[in-house]
């Protein structure tokens, strides 16, 4: 019970960190608390003993006890390891950027070792209630059967700073924004304001990051389409181009996520080793820096196939904090099974 209380506290602290109102200092304090709690968790797992035998480090296995009045009336018992390197196993998978709009029919395979679960079809397009946001919602509706949860990332970041340009007939998702004179780095905010003025119609919100690059985000997960002359200079997208985003999956155990289908989006291929990222992780792995391959699988925001550098430890980032919440929940499930 004490270990379960520790895991509950870790999850609470991860939840506190999973919002951008936190500062670097406050997240550092939360991460330090989590590391201390994990040390306490491991201390219990490594030192709890009975009659000289360790009970919670994984060595108490296949032990036999006499329970009846006659010989050989016995019962065998094993207690799994409860240290942080053995609990919290969680599977993270992130697709590569999807490139085609289509109807997506998806089936998760062998979710319980035997049965398949079909997900309701979703249309990936620029319409309201469509896109990979709708697909993620459909996946989450059957998560009680599959054990798989989905999130999406439809954020497009320009590869270079906004240039000075005069754009014509600019439109997003079929909504006309018009002609616009744009300053370098959108210094006067004209471009961002023009896009955000119609964000309730397009579903797309704009901002400029610290490098002067345009950031376009679909809040409800619908796809984005762009049109206009010279828009590549200011938003980094060509005339009559589109952007769909990527899908992220998590399972609260270490098993691979198998699927088939995906229609023209080729979603099942997008999660393969050819562009997708997959990795299983235990609780102890979040104490230090998050390896760049693991960060990619966790769905850290990126425009390229892979993240190029390691990420800050544990709850030091928003995405890391959300991953720690999943890992802590998985660890709680493991301990519930052991009890």
Language-model segments: residues:
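Amphipathic alpha-helical coiled-coil/heptad-repeat segments
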Residues: 1-339
């Amino acid at each position: 019970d004490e270990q379960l209380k520790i895991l509950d506290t870790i999850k609470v602290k991860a939840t506190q960190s999973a919002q951008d109102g936190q500062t670097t200092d406050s997240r550092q304090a939360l991460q330090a608390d989590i590391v201390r709690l994990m040390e306490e968790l491991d201390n219990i797992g490594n030192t709890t003993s009975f009659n000289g035998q360790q009970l919670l480090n994984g060595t108490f296995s296949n032990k036999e006890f006499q329970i009846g009045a006659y010989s050989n009336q016995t019962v065998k018992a094993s207690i799994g390891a409860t240290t942080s390197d053995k609990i919290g196993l969680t599977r993270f998978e992130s697709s590569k950027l999807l490139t085609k709009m289509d109807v997506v029919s998806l089936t998760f395979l062998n979710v319980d070792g035997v049965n398949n679960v079909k997900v309701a079809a979703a249309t990936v397009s620029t319409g309201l209630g469509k896109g990979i946001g709708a697909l993620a919602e459909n996946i989450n509706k059957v998560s009680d059967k599959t054990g798989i949860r989905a999130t999406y990332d439809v954020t497009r970041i320009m590869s270079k700073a906004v240039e000075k340009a005069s754009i014509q007939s600019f439109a997003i998702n079929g909504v006309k924004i018009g002609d616009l004179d744009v300053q370098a780095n959108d210094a006067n905010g004209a471009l961002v304001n023009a896009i955000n003025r119609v964000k309730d119609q397009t579903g797309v919100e704009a901002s400029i990051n610290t490098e002067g690059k345009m950031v376009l985000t679909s809040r409800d997960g619908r796809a984005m389409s762009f049109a206009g002359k010279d828009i590549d200079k200011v938003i980094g997208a060509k005339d009559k181009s589109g952007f769909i985003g990527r899908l992220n999956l998590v399972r609260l155990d270490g098993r691979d996520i198998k699927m088939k289908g995906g229609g023209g989006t080729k979603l099942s291929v997008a999660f393969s080793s050819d562009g997708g990222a997959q990795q299983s992780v235990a609780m102890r792995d979040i104490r230090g820096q998050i390896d760049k391959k693991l960060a990619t699988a966790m769905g850290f925001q990126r425009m390229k196939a892979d993240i190029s550098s390691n990420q800050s430890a544990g709850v030091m980032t928003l995405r890391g904090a959300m991953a720690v919440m999943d890992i802590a929940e998985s660890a709680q499930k493991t301990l519930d099974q052991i009890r």
